[in-house]
Regions:
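Short, well-ordered alpha-helices that flank and scaffold nucleotide-derived cofactor binding pockets
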Residues: 114, 135, 139, 205, ...
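Residue-level marker for well-ordered alpha-helical positions
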Residues: 131-132, 201
């Protein structure tokens, strides 16, 4: 029960397992004659390994004597992957079910543009996770894309901070308005997900204060 992607190592065997719904990702790669397991395909690129495939939902794989073996002891179940992997958690260059997370996010931005009737001067992403969707929106709507917010990459995720005051401070430390790009402009602000609204409220005020 529950969502998991496990990797275990004994003296002679490397084991990987994924929950029956495939909630969390796990991939198989090959580096020379050796097999590699990782939570995202981008990790394989970093070490020069070749991506082979995803571990299927409910599958257990094990590598022994440089041979890959597969078991499916839990029967067949319909995959139910976590949507946050597609829109937020996974790195944009990681593959999920045949496409990169970047492609999924860009296509979501295009779909938003098709459904939306708002007119504005600029499309601005909430970086970095909103970048791909904003690019898709910009392409579909033919509205200029600008980095109206600059991110401090040394600050973590604000929505998981324990207190409201800390979350609010985290937003200010994490993002700053790029005044030269947005002053006097009307903006379509694109973000990937909203949890409490803490971040979006602060960001909108920040952009207004910068002259948008």
């Amino acid at each position: 029960q529950g969502g998991y992607a496990l990797v275990m190592l004994t003296k002679n065997i490397l084991i990987g397992a994924r929950d029956i719904y495939g909630i969390r990702p796990l991939v198989i790669g090959k580096l020379g004659e050796l097999f590699v397991l990782a939570s995202e395909s981008c990790a394989l690129d970093i070490i020069g390994a070749t991506f082979l495939r995803e571990v299927e939902n409910g599958e257990i794989v094990y590598i022994e004597n440089n041979k890959l073996h597969s078991l499916k002891p839990f029967g067949e179940h319909k995959p139910r992957p976590c949507v946050f992997e597609y829109i937020y958690f996974s790195r944009p260059d990681s593959f999920l079910r045949g496409k990169t997370a970047y492609e999924y996010r860009k296509n979501l931005g295009k779909e938003l543009a098709r459904e939306d009737t708002v007119e504005a001067d600029l499309v601005v992403p909430v970086p970095d996770s909103g970048n791909a969707a904003a690019i898709g929106y910009s392409h579909e709507k033919k509205v200029n894309f600008e980095l109206g917010l600059i991110r401090n990459h040394y600050v973590g995720r604000t929505f998981i901070e324990p207190g409201q005051q800390i979350r609010s401070l985290g937003v200010k430390l994490k993002l700053n308005a790029n005044k030269s790009s947005i002053e006097g402009k009307s903006i379509i602000l694109v973000d990937d997900s909203l949890v409490r609204g803490t971040t979006s409220h602060k960001i909108v005020k920040m952009l207004y204060d910068a002259g948008a």
